[in-house]
Amino acid sequence: MTHEELMTLWKSEESIAHIKGWDFSHIGGRYEEEDNLPWDYEKIIRGVLRDEMKLLDYDTGGGEFLLSLGHPYENTSATEGFPPNVQLCREKLSPLGINLRECSDASHIPFADESFDIIINRHGDFDPPELHRLLKPGGLFITQQVGSDNDRELVEAVLPGTLKPFPHNDLPEQKKAFEDAGGFVVDIPGYEQPMELIMVKGL
């Protein structure tokens, strides 16, 4: 294909790649990523979650993972800040009785002090002092994150010199932030895994 044809194809892909919630089916089969993390985010949560506990899923996306937990709706809360996902959550979560709040500022989450037994967060922003405020004594924060060096080799190949979007999202710095917030017993494992692009459209 010529350069012009490729550009036309890629722009066409860009125009239709509007992801809602946690649905990445549009790029299914276009990349491969090892799925052998030394932990299981869902299993960890299920291992400690009890029906009577107050649960918050911060940055819930489209609520897909939250709903998969099957937690009693009256004890379930969620936040989301991306407008298309907020609307999606209003349609999916609110009618069930889940307490949904629109929020895009991890330092000012609109819930009262000591509201939750467990706060979960997958790939969303977070602020340790705010988490400390929201959690009941003995409460838990469980998160799975992407580090500041995620896909760095690819970024440098395509856009050399691009600044890291989340330069502080690394294990030593985050460990210290939680310790400084007080009240946290920190267990932060890390893992690096490769990703292989099958098609440029997977970007």
Predicted regions and their residues:
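Class I SAM-dependent methyltransferase SAM/SAH-binding core
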Residues: 54-108
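C-terminal helical/coil "lid" or tail adjacent to the Rossmann-like core of SAM-dependent
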Residues: 176, 192-203
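Short alpha-helix
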Residues: 166-182
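Conserved S-adenosyl-L-methionine
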Residues: 183-194
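A short acidic, Gly/Pro-enriched loop at the edge of an enzyme's catalytic core
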Residues: 108-118
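Conserved alpha-helix/loop element of class I SAM-dependent methyltransferases that forms part
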Residues: 21-26, 32-54, 64-65
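Short, glycine-/aromatic-enriched active-site segment of Class I SAM-dependent methyltransferases
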Residues: 147-165
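A short glycine-rich, Lys/Arg-flanked "PGG" loop and its adjoining helix->strand segment in the class I
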Residues: 126-142
